[in-house]
Amino acid sequence: YWMMLGDFNAVSRADNIIYGFDEDNKAFLVHDYVSGNTPYIDIVDRLHPGDFQKSTFSGRRIDFIYMTEPLFRKVRSAEIIHDGYPTSCRDPRGVTKFCYPSDHYPIIVNLKF
């Protein structure tokens, strides 16, 4: 079983209906390579085809979880969480520009072995 995940700072061609980028845009290079040259599956896209789910406040999906097929068969659900976690918070010390735990939404994956 293999998994690769994180902030790729790139976008998936599968989401281009949202972005409207030219087909030769370099923003696709990372995911084009992963999808064309590795056994990894974009699990959020596979489980929610056509249902764009942003992973950042800016409205892009740049955080991904990729898995090989054997591990993907163990996935029961996967989703990007938009409730609760990114809610504004206050720092009692008055630190400025520190109002969110992250500028990315968490991705939750449930696996069953």
Protein language model annotation of sequence segments:
Residues 1-3, 10-113:
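Metal-dependent phosphoester-hydrolase catalytic domains
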